[in-house]
């Protein structure tokens, strides 16, 4: 896992002059920045020797000039560019004139006293751009992307070691099932578990089930599975619990439809012998989402899935035309999902 290797290098004081962090996983980006700061400057030095810039506010050439300036009463300084959209196809409304050519000579010969961190918190880079190629060639690149299930389990182990708690592999997997793969959320849940078990303690399956709240996505998974299996009482109870948590019924309906469509797509691709890896690329979904869907669709009939999506459209229409109150309408739709599970098709 690329970023964990870089974290370990930084903690050994092996700090590179320029880092290029790109991707949407905010926790990875923040942890990289925090580790660089902690292992480069003392708290007192950080006040005078950490500069943060946004391209939307400051010309790139001025940021490079700052990077080329010696630190103030310190052996090191850190310069951070927060939103490097120049490496993407994203348009920006700013009228600031960026001299992109000022970056190349600096990347080839960075100031030894400066650590430059360039952040592109976007899903995709524009690989055709010269600046993107320069960054990928002349910097230490860390892709802050969603982790696979295996990588997430490994990451939980690293975080558990830092927190001084013991988490067995089955408990790690349960944690991911409940909290999802968002690292910020997982770190928060692990911290909660540490407070419960104490430093040096073991986090049990019972503790995770008791302490960790399901994500909305996981609740949707469970709700559909219970409904399609005819376990209506459990499905309705799940829905009412989501409403008690202040989840908007229309949002729940939208997510139900999204999940049903994912199931339908995965079902069709599975029948055509596509692998889960191929499905991830085609559907642009997280590998963990595809893995769960592939496991669940085994017991789902394709015609029932299509009928369920049509029933959801009818429910949405009834709500938006004022024919049915939204909470009642979504609950009725969940009951209909259960009815579909018992219907036979020729």
Model features per residue range: what roles?
Residues 1-346:
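Conserved beta/loop motifs at nucleotide-recognition and modification sites
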